[in-house]
């Protein structure tokens, strides 16, 4: 068993706390700045080096990037392209010893928050939800569509994930 923590793609105080607590393995978030190319080995090399130089060995990716995940879950016109982009990540993940990618099939939106920096005791920042601040999206998906899209995704990626 290994002790791992969640690391955002950019260094923040959580990185320092994890290292000072003895954490040496990371569940990492990929950059979602539009510049990170999931299919580009050099981008993966640079990202992984940033973590290893800090003393953290990446062991898993979480979440699957939302710009891919959302199209796959709702099964829109970018679904197949998004699945290909996910599959293109696998060889680079493997080459760095990252054998796990976390995904969810919650109906379109994963974890829903309306605030991400509410101050609590001792100045700690927490997330929150306030119905008055919630702006509903105009997308609907049935349970059957979601299950169909899940099956489509799994059948597409498993042959590549098992390599």
Protein language model features and the residues they cover:
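Active-site acidic/histidine proton-transfer and metal-coordination neighborhood
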Residues: 72-163
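N-terminal ordered "arm"
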Residues: 12-35
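Conserved, mostly hydrophobic/aromatic
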Residues: 18, 26, 51, 93, ...
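Active-site beta-loop-alpha junctions enriched in small/polar residues
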Residues: 6-10, 29-33, 63-66, 105-108
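Conserved beta-strand positions in the central sheet of alpha/beta enzyme cores
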Residues: 26-27, 60, 102
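Glycine-rich, proline-tolerant flexible connector loops at the mouths of alpha/beta enzymes
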Residues: 29-46, 107-112
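Aromatic-lined substrate-binding rim segments of carbohydrate-active enzymes
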Residues: 38-55, 77
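Short, acidic/polar
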Residues: 7-20, 40, 47, 81-91, ...
């Amino acid at each position: 068993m290994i002790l791992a923590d969640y690391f955002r793609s950019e260094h923040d105080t959580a990185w320092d706390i994890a290292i000072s607590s003895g954490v040496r393995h990371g569940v990492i978030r990929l950059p979602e700045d539009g510049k990170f190319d999931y299919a580009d080995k050099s981008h993966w090399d640079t990202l992984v080096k940033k973590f290893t130089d800090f003393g953290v060995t990446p062991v898993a990716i979480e979440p699957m990037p939302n710009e891919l995940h959302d199209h796959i879950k709702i099964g829109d016109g970018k679904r197949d392209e998004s699945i290909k982009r996910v599959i293109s990540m696998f060889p680079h993940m493997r080459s760095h010893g990252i054998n796990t990618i976390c995904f969810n099939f919650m109906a379109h939106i994963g974890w829903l928050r309306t605030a991400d920096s509410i101050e609590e005791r001792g100045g700690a920042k927490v997330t929150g939800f306030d119905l008055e601040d919630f702006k509903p999206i105009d997308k609907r998906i049935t349970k059957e569509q979601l299950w169909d899209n899940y099956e489509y995704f799994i059948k597409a990626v498993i042959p590549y994930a098992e390599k």
